[in-house]
Amino acid sequence: MQLFWHRRDLRTTDNRGLAAAAPGVTAVDGGHDQGPVAAVFCFDDEVLAHAAPPRVAFMLDALAALRERYRDLGSDLIVRHGDPAAVLPAVANDLDATRVVWNHDYSGLATDRDAGVRDALDAAGVAHAQFHDAVHHRPGEIRTNAGDPYSVYTYFWRKWQDREKNPPAPEPEPADLAADTALADTSPLPSVQELGFAEPEAAVPDAGTAAARSLLDAFRESGDIYRYEDRRDYPHEEPTSRLSPHLKFGTIGIRTVYEAARAAKSDADTDDERENVAAFIGQLAWREFYAQVLYFNQNVVSENFKAYEHPIEWRDDPAALQAWKDGETGYPIVDAGMRQLRAEAYMHNRVRMIVAAFLTKDLLVDWRAGYDWFREKLADHDTANDNGGWQWAASTGTDAQPYFRVFNPMTQGERYDPDADYITEFVPELRDVPADAIHSWHELSLSERRRHAPEYPDPIVDHSQRREDAIAMFERARGDE
């Protein structure tokens, strides 16, 4: 018998490690005869220490769906809680398993954990194998001609799109899996509270492969994929896939998403439609670019990627930070985004850029404070993606927004939410206010603002002044002053 250790790959289809372990599947590892596979998931306290209620709730829902799928296949999911370096050798011993298989993860925490598991399995005399599954191309596979990892996305993308991609891996057959009667006690799944977390305040999206597949199919069949590039920045329309939490937890495989996009591109009727699909595929490449940046620069989780001559003089402003978190800044598009985050454990991507730019360039607050808040509230928080996005907005990251380009939150709102539909969905105080007044809120007199929406706050900063302050702050950090 073998064990397959699930982590952020909570699915049975298009799972390269699971397919490689399955004796009857030859597409990934060429086939072997090392016995049927028993699936195991381990709640790791070190990983849970970095979790938050929305993601824990989503993960538990995904695990319930995964367990149900294994039961449909005549097997089950073994659930344990503890240090994987102790749990996996013990489960292997209980089941007389001779090999443990899992998929690579690329964060510093994951690579350290996996090294400890390998050492423990070696000491127990249990073989092990790992496979690349979460990305098409493992970190370091795509490099510059000089052999260095890319730090500029455009050049990475050019090579990424030309590389051959693996097809989706097949799901194991029931005969490939350990029968449920042969498994040790599988244990019930804990609740969010039993894992030490409060119930999430947000409405967490449905998890599981069926939910992910439904989203992907709807993205194609509705035609949204053919409008993706043209309309993705408009939060009220949002022709996006909403697959981000599913890719985070691996309830759908990256190859499945890529193949669906390729098929849509092949079926496109016009060059414009093909360009829209290509833009979506480009976002899949961004995900792998940031995974590579993190893999080779683990310090970016807490440090600027880009070195400045002097420290950036971020402001310690708890009141401004709290107003930003609460969606009470007096900048409507910013407040709508922050309130969507609380309500849905999600925020539209364009609005993520706007609120990140506002925190770092208008409030002059360190990007790490915003990153930490997103990590606490997002169901789709991914260390590499979120860190890359925050450092891009803060002009501290790889291939980042130039420091002198400062988003104007009012013009951003007017451009991407012209009728204020998104804003008024999440900021009810403004629902009876005309769109032109919402987009000129900062220019209205105090009496006009009180007449339109007495409960909505005044702008907490003057954008024009803070733009100058932000540029000066970065010029001092650069040593220009």
Swiss-Prot record:
Keyword Amino-acid biosynthesis applies: no
Pfam families on file: DNA_photolyase, FAD_binding_7
Function recorded in the entry: Involved in repair of UV radiation-induced DNA damage. Catalyzes the light-dependent monomerization (300-600 nm) of cyclobutyl pyrimidine dimers (in cis-syn configuration), which are formed between adjacent bases on the same DNA strand upon exposure to ultraviolet radiation.
Site (Electron transfer via tryptophanyl radical): W314, W367, W390
Family (UniProt): Belongs to the DNA photolyase class-1 family.
Keyword match DNA repair: yes
Record-linked PROSITE patterns: DNA_PHOTOLYASES_1_1, DNA_PHOTOLYASES_1_2, PHR_CRY_ALPHA_BETA
Cofactor dependency: FAD; coenzyme F420-(gamma-Glu)n
Enzyme class label: lyase
Subunit relationships: Monomer.
Chain segments carrying region Interaction with DNA: 283-290, 349-350
Cofactor note: Binds 1 FAD per subunit. Binds 1 coenzyme F420 non-covalently per subunit.
Protein's name according to its UniProt entry: Deoxyribodipyrimidine photo-lyase
GO MF entries: deoxyribodipyrimidine photo-lyase activity; DNA binding; FAD binding
Residues that, per the record, bind DNA: R232, Q412
Ranges for domain Photolyase/cryptochrome alpha/beta: 1-136
Residues given in the record as FAD binding sites: Y228, T240, S241, R242, L243, S244, D380, H381, D382
Catalytic activities: cyclobutadipyrimidine (in DNA) = 2 pyrimidine residues (in DNA)
